[in-house]
Amino acid sequence: MIPRERILSVLSKYDESDVKIGTICSHSSLQIFNGARREGLRSVGIVLRENKPYYESFPRASPDIFIEVDSYGDLLSEETQEELISENVIMIPHGSFVEYVGSENILERFRVPMFGNRLTLYWEGDRRRQRKWLEDAGVPTPRIYRSPEDIDRPVIVKLHGAKGGKGYFKASSPEEFYEKFSELKERGLVGSLEDVVIEEFIVGVRFYPHFFFSPIEGENIADLEGGRLELLGIDRRLEVIDEIHRGLPDLMEDFMDYTVTGNIPVIVREKYLVDLLRDAVKIISSSRRLFYPGLIGPFCMEMIYNPSRGFITFEVSARIVAGTNLYTDGSPYSYYYYDEPMSMGRRIAREIKEAVKSGSLHKIIY
């Protein structure tokens, strides 16, 4: 793993008057580039050659500079990394960046300074490690089954990493699990039982609150020292299975798919905001204990509300999530913090800009 000191050494050679924001042209990049533009920062997009014309077609959300690659794996080449460093680029991780480049490669081989704490990708990328994080935080979570033989009620089986629900399946018995697991194996999505996590299926309403934590701003919640926590939006994900009611009886199996295809805006009853913020505080506090300096910047708690059990957290995405694309002009919650449109992409850019002004860029980079 590249030590933080080495990344900060690279950062120390940057011309901070010309810092640029960079990311892969995918996932939430349009929002990130637009946010940089609104904050007066230039941006760099790493784009597949065949995709460049389409990203150029968005005049207010295309990057100022394109770096064309044949595959996203090229991002790890010395040539590409040196080009990014020479442009004073701070990379913004998102789901596609993590999935296409790989959290292990980012930790071991990617020398370009990144916004936030890249150790979060290590803890996020493996569901067993992430479960340790959630348990340390003390937030309610679904039961995890150590063996398929223990399945005694409906479960959902998930793959590791940022796969957007691809390959997930539901089972109610060991026999059903092995049948569907074998199908995944034939498709090459899994190799062994170590590649999946078996999780209790919780009935309820899904909520995905988007948070931003700044370690350079003043405290705004008494239970959370050393920074400011903001709730900038909430979404729920539109999965293929959500459209099952539209299928003909002989097509029902085609809809039994948890692949995320889009996002829908949501607000919660105001009394529940305290629950969301309280659990977010626990997640941040735990992250500091487990992987100092802990969470920095955007993150999302993936939750289900069950009437008898309250909010249950089944996952944390320790980066900007695609659901924030709903709020490129701000959300109902962002206006409680800012008297101007504030997307998550813009909030990232502002944090970087303010860190440069205050001489604290090193506090938000790894």
From Swiss-Prot:
InterPro entries: ATP-grasp, ATP_grasp_subdomain_1, IMP_biosynth_PurP, IMP_biosynth_PurP_C, IMP_biosynth_PurP_N, PreATP-grasp_dom_sf. One of its GO terms (biological process) is 'de novo' IMP biosynthetic process. 5-amino-1-(5-phospho-beta-D-ribosyl)imidazole-4-carboxamide binds at residues 27, 96, 263. Its cofactor is Mg(2+); Mn(2+). Mg(2+) binds at residues 302, 315. It is an enzyme of class 6 (ligase). Pathway: Purine metabolism; IMP biosynthesis via de novo pathway; 5-formamido-1-(5-phospho-D-ribosyl)imidazole-4-carboxamide from 5-amino-1-(5-phospho-D-ribosyl)imidazole-4-carboxamide (formate route): step 1/1. Residues 131-357 form the ATP-grasp domain. It holds the Pfam family DUF1297. GO terms for molecular function: ATP binding; ligase activity, forming carbon-nitrogen bonds; magnesium ion binding. It comes from the Archaea. Keywords: ATP-binding, Ligase, Magnesium, Manganese, Metal-binding, Nucleotide-binding, Purine biosynthesis. Its EC number is 6.3.4.23. Binds 1 Mg(2+) or Mn(2+) ion per subunit. ATP binds at residues 154-208, 239. It catalyses: 5-amino-1-(5-phospho-beta-D-ribosyl)imidazole-4-carboxamide + formate + ATP = 5-formamido-1-(5-phospho-D-ribosyl)imidazole-4-carboxamide + ADP + phosphate. The keyword DNA damage does not apply. Catalyzes the ATP- and formate-dependent formylation of 5-aminoimidazole-4-carboxamide-1-beta-d-ribofuranosyl 5'-monophosphate (AICAR) to 5-formaminoimidazole-4-carboxamide-1-beta-d-ribofuranosyl 5'-monophosphate (FAICAR) in the absence of folates. Belongs to the phosphohexose mutase family. This is 5-formaminoimidazole-4-carboxamide-1-(beta)-D-ribofuranosyl 5'-monophosphate synthetase. It comes from Korarchaeum cryptofilum (strain OPF8). The gene is purP.
